[in-house]
Amino acid sequence: MAIPIGETINLKAINDSVSDNILKSDKSEIFGQLKRLVHIADVGVHDIHMQEHTEEEFKFPDFVPESQRKQFVQAHKWEVKMIHKSNGKDFPLDMDLESTGTKYLFGMGARVLDVLNRGGLLACDEMNIATHSELFKLLVSLFNNTRSNPKNAQLLFTTHDASVIADGAFRARG
């Protein structure tokens, strides 16, 4: 089941298997696919950089229990920056400063790519609520394409916006 993405993004909240696949390395296959998806979506992001921070980089007061330190480090060890181009120069922007739609694309895109790679079902409530209709259609179209969906993954979603199905993009594959 998909977890809604709001104003913040917590990659560990995506779900452990998806986030572990993304975060095990900035060279992982799913991270490369996610970078391509963000580029194709044309949200102004030129590249994505991830940096892993070690436990030693976090300075905790002595009174903070070890269990809380580990939990904090696990939740904050990855720093994600979206790289934009401005006047030919790279301009990194922290993920928390990105738009809700870009955060949604990063989080939902990871889930979509994970289920496309594994096969199975992705269920989402109000999948299109935090994103532009064209971006929503792009994510859904990945399920109707045999190249991007060779394992016949399925998408089940709810929406109150009937306009997203007006162009026939949601037909059965055959």
Residue ranges and their predicted role:
Residues 1-105, 109, 117:
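Phosphate-coordinating catalytic segments in nucleotide- and nucleic-acid-processing enzymes
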